Amino acid sequence: MRHLALLAAILVATVTAGYAQEADDPELIFKKTTVWRMLSPDAKLATYALDDPLVEGVACHFTVPEIGGWKGWAGFAEERSEISLACRQVGPISFSGTFEQGEDMYRQRRSMFFKKMQIVRGCDATRNVLVYLVYSDRIIEGSPQNSTSTVPIMPWGDEPAPKCAEFLED
């Protein structure tokens, strides 16, 4: 009976965690086939859009390779580490809280157990520029593959531009 209750609790936690994560999921813009396969799913490049949850007025777009074939379809193939990133100011910038240099903005699993992709955020206080870095890592070793994008914080309309340094945690 104990095992059944524990299994039910794990199932509920897993299901509710999945629903909570959906709010942060990026929006798929499009996919482009890179390797055509007749009898299994194609390999593709997928481009996504993601709004920074802490910094209103900033949107990032990233492109990731998606492995084709049956292993890729089932989630057993290890995804490649090449990820491109572009972030832009798309409206007036406002901060909903403070953040640390290198704080996670978004995280996604790229293989069943070992690899994850991360987009982290920082602030170049001297130039009043938000800096975004995307990279993938493994439990044992990281990957040198990365991409950086910067967003100079500019005034929007009549509002003065906020200073990102004012929202950095010490």
Report each predicted region and the residues it spans:
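Bacterial N-terminal signal peptides that target proteins for export
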Residues: 1-6
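Bacterial N-terminal signal peptides
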Residues: 7-14
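Short, low-complexity disordered leader/linker segments with a strong preference
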Residues: 15-16, 20
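N-terminal secretory signal peptides
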Residues: 21-86
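Generic structural motif
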Residues: 50-52, 65, 90-92, 137, ...
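Mature extracytoplasmic domains of secretory-pathway proteins
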Residues: 57-125
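Beta-strand-rich cores of mature extracytoplasmic or soluble domains
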Residues: 94-170
